[in-house]
Amino acid sequence: MDWRVLIVLTPLLIAGGWAVFNIGAAALRQAQQFLSKQS
C-alpha cells in the first residue's frame, strides 16, 4: 500500500470519527431529554 494514500486518508478518518462522535453525543442528549419529558 502506498504511504501517500495513508497520508490522505488519515485526516479524513479522524475528521469523520470526530463528526460521528459529536453527532452521537448530541443525539444521546436529545434522546435523554425526550425520554425525561415523556415520564
From Swiss-Prot:
NCBIfam families recorded: PRK13240.1
Superkingdom classification of source: Bacteria
GO cellular component: photosystem II; plasma membrane-derived thylakoid membrane
Subunit text: PSII is composed of 1 copy each of membrane proteins PsbA, PsbB, PsbC, PsbD, PsbE, PsbF, PsbH, PsbI, PsbJ, PsbK, PsbL, PsbM, PsbT, PsbX, PsbY, PsbZ, Psb30/Ycf12, peripheral proteins PsbO, CyanoQ (PsbQ), PsbU, PsbV and a large number of cofactors. It forms dimeric complexes.
Keyword hit for Transmembrane: yes
Organism per entry: Microcystis aeruginosa (strain NIES-843 / IAM M-2473)
Entry similarity comment: Belongs to the PsbY family.
Subcellular location: Cellular thylakoid membrane
InterPro entries: PSII_PsbY (IPR009388)
UniProt record, GO biological process: photosynthesis
Range of residues in the leader sequence: none
Keywords: Membrane, Photosynthesis, Photosystem II, Thylakoid, Transmembrane, Transmembrane helix
Protein name: Photosystem II reaction center protein Y
Its job: Loosely associated component of the core of photosystem II (PSII), it is not always seen in crystals. PSII is a light-driven water plastoquinone oxidoreductase, using light energy to abstract electrons from H(2)O, generating a proton gradient subsequently used for ATP formation.
Gene responsible for this protein: psbY
